[in-house]
Amino acid sequence: MSVELEEALPVTTAEGMAKKVTKAGGSAALSPSKKRKNSKKKNQPGKYSQLVVETIRRLGERNGSSLAKIYTEAKKVPWFDQQNGRTYLKYSIKALVQNDTLLQVKGTGANGSFKLNRKKLEGGGERRGAPAAATAPAPTAHKAKKAAPGAAGSRRADKKPARGQKPEQRSHKKGAGAKKDKGGKAKKTAAAGGKKVKKAAKPSVPKVPKGRK
């Protein structure tokens, strides 16, 4: 029996080691995805910070909004934590002040009044939109270059008929002269024909010899 147990024990230990290795491999495979999720969460602003910015924008007070006003407006959101939400708002306000997203108008710490730093908020949007605005005029320049040869061709086409108009005028003049010449020739031929007709109009009288009377 002891021999059989000795033979069976290494098998069980080997199976246990294999299971441990597979578990360790699974945890190692899952760890990079967890790290990525954590890095994304760190890069993105917290939802309470976004809530603070939105509430201050909604209130729109010139002299800044206090923590009490921000809290009363922010707690209307359905996902707001009613127990710890106020402390989360304090931390997010401090972070936004350090970030230069918020300007502290009055007081010190989280007990003062806060206002949005519009230069930073609007400047970020302008910087993002600047490359797109810079690249936008490029296609219009290409279109203008493409349109320029067409315009030059149309100008050349306009100039060519101008040259061709002079021969037309000359041809008209020649045509008028030709008409005049033809008219003069027709008159001359008509006059000559009239003379011939007049000459032919005289009747030819047969001459009678004098000796036969």
UniProtKB/Swiss-Prot annotation:
**What InterPro entries does this protein map onto?**
H1/H5 (IPR005819), Histone_H1/H5_H15 (IPR005818), WH-like_DNA-bd_sf (IPR036388), WH_DNA-bd_sf (IPR036390)
User: Subunit info?
Assistant: Interacts with RRP1B.
- Protein keywords: Acetylation, Chromosome, Citrullination, DNA-binding, Nucleus, Phosphoprotein
Describe, from its UniProt entry, the tissues in which this protein is expressed.
Expressed ubiquitously.
Q: Name one GO cellular component term.
A: nucleoplasm
Question: What is the name of this protein?
Answer: Histone H1.10
The listed locations are: Nucleus; Chromosome
Gene Ontology biological process: chromosome condensation; negative regulation of DNA recombination; nucleosome assembly
Q: Which family does it belong to?
A: Belongs to the histone H1/H5 family.
- Residue segments, region Disordered: 22-49, 107-213
> Could you tell me which residues carry N-acetylserine?
S2
Citrulline-modified residues are: R62
- Report if keyword Nucleus is assigned: yes
Origin organism of this chain? Homo sapiens
Gene (name only):
H1-10
Could you tell me one molecular function GO term of this UniProt entry?
A: nucleosomal DNA binding
